[in-house]
């Protein structure tokens, strides 16, 4: 997989990462719906423990919503945070109403599977989709959300960096290495919180100064 490309290769990597998202109880991947549902269930359980409200009361529902929106609103200041928060709100409302169809559409959006804004607007009422240009921003949003949902954060594992090494076009290779540099800098500078990134490649695809990772001087100076 590539991290950047002219034909949606970066988005394809994002789709694979989200499709394979795993937890201890769902190690085989496909855990996104489980994570979202458990988050809402945990908020409901916490609300019940903190109050004498009955789960079927309007007051209980309002107390749960207050906690849900506290998490959602805290993401608004991040890049694309408002849109991400809006989708979380749609998911929560669908969960509360037992609307599995809308839940499925929101998960489809989170997975980056809407090809056009028109399609997303028609099905969800939102005029934005995840693209090759901004997919990494949504990874950062997911990591922040996961922290607030009770997890330690997100650990991303990307193997086969040799696929970037094999890209014949030098400019395209450089764009991919630039994306790695962005990730590296973000984690060190605190712009990407609660996220760990492990990338693997052969010694040659890392150390080759002609076309490997070390061919991008800004990376070589940091990693060598």
Model features per residue range: what roles?
Residues 100-224:
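The catalytic "switch" region of P-loop NTPases
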């Amino acid at each position: 997989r590539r991290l950047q490309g002219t034909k949606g290769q970066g988005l394809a990597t994002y789709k694979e990462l989200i499709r394979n998202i795993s937890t201890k109880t769902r190690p085989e991947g496909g855990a996104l719906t489980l994570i979202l549902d458990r988050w809402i269930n945990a908020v409901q359980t916490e609300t019940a423990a903190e109050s004498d409200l009955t789960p079927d009361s309007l007051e209980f529902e309002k107390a749960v919503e207050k906690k849900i929106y506290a998490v959602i609103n805290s993401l608004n200041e991040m890049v694309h945070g408002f849109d991400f928060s809006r989708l979380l709100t749609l998911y929560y409302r669908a969960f509360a109403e037992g609307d599995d169809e809308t839940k499925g559409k929101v998960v489809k959006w989170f997975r980056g599977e809407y090809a056009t804004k028109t399609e997303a607007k028609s099905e969800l009422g939102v005029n934005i989709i995840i693209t090759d240009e901004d997919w990494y921003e949504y990874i950062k949003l997911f990591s922040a959300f996961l922290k607030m949902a009770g997890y330690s954060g997100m650990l991303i594992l990307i193997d086969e960096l040799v696929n970037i090494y094999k890209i014949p076009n030098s400019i395209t290779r450089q764009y991919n290495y630039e994306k790695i540099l962005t990730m590296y800098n973000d984690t060190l500078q605190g712009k990407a919180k609660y996220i760990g990134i492990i990338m693997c490649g052969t010694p040659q695809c890392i150390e080759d100064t002609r076309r490997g990772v070390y061919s991008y001087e800004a990376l070589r100076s940091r990693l060598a």
